Amino acid sequence: MYMIYGVSDCPHCLRAQALCMESDVDYAWVMMDWSKQYREHIKSDWKWKTYPIITKMYFTERTSSEVLVGGFDELQLELLSLDQ
């Protein structure tokens, strides 16, 4: 499952969401509109300078982990590689 940390007026954020829908992959949209301080915190945590910040969640019976995919371009490349 992908997590899309995005802002509602960000074209690349909306394109990432649309790409997940078109590709029929599970995703969750995390709206980052409301707190500029939290947006900056998330960018710092993931060491990514722009939105969207896209991660992939991995689940096991007892744990979960979240790995950075990148932005829209990186998501697009990853989904294209899954199609092959």
How would you label these PLM feature ranges?
Residues 56-84:
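Non-catalytic, surface beta->alpha helical segment in thiol-disulfide oxidoreductase systems
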Residues 12, 38, 75:
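Short phosphate-engaging motifs
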Residues 9, 34, 74:
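Residues that form or immediately flank small-molecule/cofactor binding pockets and catalytic motifs
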